[in-house]
Amino acid sequence: MIALLTGKLAYKSPEFIILDVNGVGYQVHIPFSTYYTLPAEGGALSLQIHTSVKEDAINLYGFRTQQEKELFQLLIGVSGVGPKLATGILSNSEPSELADSLVNGNLARLSAIPGIGKKTAERLVLELKEKMKKLGLAQPQAGGATAPAKQEIRDDVLSALINLGYKEAVVQKALAELKVTEDATVELVLKQALKILMK
């Protein structure tokens, strides 16, 4: 099993990256918490990897920290939660916020995440509440890239939220309520948009 990859970032998007390791390109699925810490394309990158093996496919999931990887593995250990949904959960909630929701049994917060119904939320709390108390979670570090143009930020957030399962019209309405400042980042605008969508 592949557990760690180190190489050059050949391509990045909010859903996956391509990591060039000695001339071999690995497609690695990532959550937003990892996307926001990525260097510019061409930069050096090391990712903690979870390898998902199925009969017809092998998929790689990458994380900047071991803690994120452990949280991902705890999530997919819950019945009904596969790698895609686990990635979506991490994309919609910072690790510390997710842990807080699980420990405190915040079903409303969990159920607001696309793909999670009340029963799945209850199952997550039941199976992970005690494990979350034992797992130390760090806030994801913000990347050091320069701020992109306002429209580019809106486009990135729109694309990311649509890929998470939100309808374009709903996302556009949420973005219309936001004021994107000169120093805004994709991460900041995404968090603000998610707060509006989860009301």
Swiss-Prot record:
The RuvA-RuvB-RuvC complex processes Holliday junction (HJ) DNA during genetic recombination and DNA repair, while the RuvA-RuvB complex plays an important role in the rescue of blocked DNA replication forks via replication fork reversal (RFR). RuvA specifically binds to HJ cruciform DNA, conferring on it an open structure. The RuvB hexamer acts as an ATP-dependent pump, pulling dsDNA into and through the RuvAB complex. HJ branch migration allows RuvC to scan DNA until it finds its consensus sequence, where it cleaves and resolves the cruciform DNA. The gene is ruvA. Keywords: Cytoplasm, DNA damage, DNA recombination, DNA repair, DNA-binding. Pfam families: HHH_5, RuvA_C, RuvA_N. Homotetramer. Forms an RuvA(8)-RuvB(12)-Holliday junction (HJ) complex. HJ DNA is sandwiched between 2 RuvA tetramers; dsDNA enters through RuvA and exits via RuvB. An RuvB hexamer assembles on each DNA strand where it exits the tetramer. Each RuvB hexamer is contacted by two RuvA subunits (via domain III) on 2 adjacent RuvB subunits; this complex drives branch migration. In the full resolvosome a probable DNA-RuvA(4)-RuvB(12)-RuvC(2) complex forms which resolves the HJ. Residues 144-148 are annotated as: Flexible linker. Residues 1-64 are annotated as: Domain I. This is Holliday junction branch migration complex subunit RuvA. It comes from the Bacteria. Disulfide bonds: none annotated. Residues 149-199 are annotated as: Domain III. GO terms for molecular function: ATP binding; four-way junction DNA binding; four-way junction helicase activity. It comes from Geobacter sp. (strain M21). HAMAP family: DNA_HJ_migration_RuvA. It is found in: Cytoplasm. One of its GO terms (cellular component) is Holliday junction resolvase complex. Residues 65-143 are annotated as: Domain II. Gene3D superfamilies: 5' to 3' exonuclease, C-terminal subdomain, DNA helicase RuvA subunit, C-terminal domain, Nucleic acid-binding proteins. Has three domains with a flexible linker between the domains II and III and assumes an 'L' shape. Domain III is highly mobile and contacts RuvB.
